[in-house]
Amino acid sequence: TIINVKCTSPKQCLPPCKAQFGQSAGAKCMNGKCKCYPH
């Protein structure tokens, strides 16, 4: 799931992804935007 959060590294995406999808969510930075992987 791509969320509307800008990023330069996956670490920046983990907090918003965890907030939206739970503590076990994973995150990547793709094309300057965060992509969350719910688990």
From Swiss-Prot:
Residues of the site described as Aromatic residue of the functional dyad: Y37
Pfam family, one: Toxin_2
SUPFAM superfamilies associated with the record: Scorpion toxin-like
Organs and tissues of expression: Expressed by the venom gland.
Region (Interaction with Kv1.3 channels): 37-39
GO MF, any single term: toxin activity
Gene Ontology CC annotations of this record: extracellular region
Subcellular compartments: Secreted
Keywords, sorted A to Z: Disulfide bond, Ion channel impairing toxin, Neurotoxin, Potassium channel impairing toxin, Secreted, Toxin, Voltage-gated potassium channel impairing toxin
InterPro entries: Scorpion_toxin-like_sf, Scorpion_toxinS_K_inh
Residues marked Basic residue of the functional dyad (site): K28
Cystine crosslinks: C7-C29, C13-C34, C17-C36
Major localisation: secreted
Role description: Potent inhibitor of voltage-gated potassium channels such as Kv1.1/KCNA1 (IC(50)=0.144 nM), Kv1.2/KCNA2 (IC(50)=0.675 nM), Kv1.3/KCNA3 (IC(50)=0.23 nM) and Shaker (Kd=160 nM). Suppresses expression of the Kv1.3/KCNA3 channel in lipopolysaccharide (LPS)-stimulated mouse macrophages. Down-regulates secretion of nitric oxide (NO) and inflammatory cytokines, such as TNF-alpha/TNF, IL-1beta/IL1B and IL6, in LPS-stimulated mouse macrophages in a manner dependent on Kv1.3/KCNA3 channel blockage. Reduces activation of MAPK and NF-kappa-B signaling pathways in LPS-stimulated mouse macrophages.
Domain comment (free text): Has the structural arrangement of an alpha-helix connected to a beta-sheet by disulfide bonds (CSalpha/beta).
Similarity field: Belongs to the short scorpion toxin superfamily. Potassium channel inhibitor family. Alpha-KTx 02 subfamily.
Descriptive protein name: Potassium channel toxin alpha-KTx 2.2
